Amino acid sequence: MKNMMKKYYELQNLNDKEKMDYFRAVYPNLNDNIIYYFLVRHLGTEFVYEEFSQLNLSKCYVEELELSNNQIFEIEYADFCSFKNETVQYYNILNEVAPNYFITGTWTGPILTTPRNNKLVAIDGNNRLRMLRCYLKHTNMPICDKHRIYVIRQND
């Protein structure tokens, strides 16, 4: 990930489809959801690359896990994440910004994590993680027992 900012300047004028095609070719080991949400949408987001610079994405694999409601609260936010508001006031706007919670009982977009210091840390989806926690804390609507997250691990 150390060279991602250099690559940003080469890719910044491409549309999302062209960026997807590029990243699919470079990282065939990553699925489309991870490529889109993590690489295409965050292309040029320097603080993401700095915090997780130890990852060599070409040597990583992605594992899908289902976590319980309690386990969702054990995931740490990335250091760069400054907005961690999980209050009822924030929950009250979820109906407008994330209505899929009320249909599915979980978040349907990917939350990408990686192990650090024996904990999972959100690389991508910090806001989705916050909204999911908000929903779990404050809703009277149905809640799923399990929530899908992704863990990116580096092969040794």
Spans of features found by a protein language model:
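Basic- and aromatic-enriched surface patches that contact anionic nucleotides/nucleic acids
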Residues: M1-R24, R116-D156
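N-terminal extension/subdomain marker
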Residues: M1-E64
